[in-house]
C-alpha cells in the first residue's frame, strides 16, 4: 500500500449543482463527427490518377468547385457535382483500362450482340460495380458510392419532391468523403 502526502497544497470542495454527462457526450460526438468530416486524404493527387492527362485540369477545377459549394453551404449543388465527378473519374479509369473493364462479369452487355457496351452508354452504377470487380474500389467505397449515386439522382426535381430530399451540409460532406476515399483507393490500386 502506498501513501502519498502532499505538502503545502490546498484543496477546495464545493457542492455541485448537478452532473450533466449528456452534454459532454454530445460535445464528444460533435467533435468526432466534425473531425471525420474535415479529415483529408493528404496523399491524394489528382494528377496521379490513371486517367487521361487532358482530364486532370477539369477534375482539379471540379474538386475546387465542390469545396466552394461546401463553403457557401450549397449542399445539393455539391452532391450533384461530387456524383458527376466520381462518374467522370471512373470513366477516365475505365478508358485507361478498357480490356479489364470490358471483360468484367458486371460490364453491361449489348442485348443484341452480347458484346460490352461502349463506355458512353454505361451508367454510374455500372462504373461503380465494375470498378469494384476489377479492384479499383473496395467494398466499403462501392457501397457508399451507390448511396452517393442515389443522392446524385435527386438532380431531377420531381424525384427530389416525391421523396422530400433536403440534404444538409453534413450529407454533402459525407458524400465528399466518399469521393475522396474513392480517389484514394484508385490511386493506391494504380500504384500496385
Regions found by a protein language model. Name each.
Residues 1, 52-56, 75-79, 117, ...:
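Amphipathic, non-membrane alpha-helical segments in soluble helical-bundle scaffolds
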Residues 93, 97, 101, 156-159, ...:
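Short amphipathic alpha-helical interaction/hinge segments
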Residues 3-76, 177, 191:
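Charged alpha-helical initiation segments
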Residues 134-192:
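Charge-enriched, short contiguous segments at helix-coil
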Residues 96-145:
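Flexible secondary-structure boundary motifs
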Residues 63-95:
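Short, hydrophobic, well-ordered secondary-structure elements
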Residues 57-61, 122-123, 147-150:
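Generic alpha-helical secondary structure signal
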Amino acid at each position: 500500500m502506498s501513501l502519498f502526502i502532499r505538502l503545502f497544497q490546498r484543496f477546495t470542495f464545493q457542492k455541485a449543482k448537478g452532473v450533466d454527462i449528456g452534454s459532454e457526450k454530445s460535445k464528444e460526438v460533435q467533435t468526432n463527427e466534425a473531425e471525420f468530416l474535415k479529415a483529408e486524404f493528404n496523399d491524394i493527387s489528382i494528377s496521379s490518377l490513371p486517367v487521361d492527362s487532358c482530364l486532370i485540369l477539369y477534375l482539379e477545377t471540379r474538386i475546387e468547385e465542390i469545396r466552394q459549394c461546401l463553403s457557401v453551404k450549397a449542399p445539393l449543388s455539391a452532391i450533384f457535382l461530387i456524383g458527376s465527378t466520381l462518374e467522370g473519374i471512373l470513366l477516365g479509369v475505365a478508358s485507361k483500362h478498357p480490356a479489364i473493364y470490358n471483360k468484367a462479369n458486371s460490364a453491361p452487355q449489348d442485348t443484341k450482340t452480347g458484346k460490352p457496351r461502349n463506355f458512353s452508354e454505361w451508367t454510374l452504377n455500372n462504373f461503380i460495380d465494375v470498378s469494384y470487380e476489377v479492384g479499383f474500389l473496395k467494398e466499403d467505397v462501392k457501397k457508399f458510392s451507390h448511396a452517393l449515386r442515389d443522392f446524385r439522382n435527386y438532380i431531377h426535381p420531381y424525384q427530389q419532391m416525391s421523396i422530400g430530399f433536403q440534404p444538409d451540409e453534413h450529407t454533402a460532406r459525407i458524400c465528399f468523403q466518399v469521393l475522396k476515399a474513392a480517389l484514394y483507393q484508385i490511386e493506391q490500386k494504380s500504384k500496385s
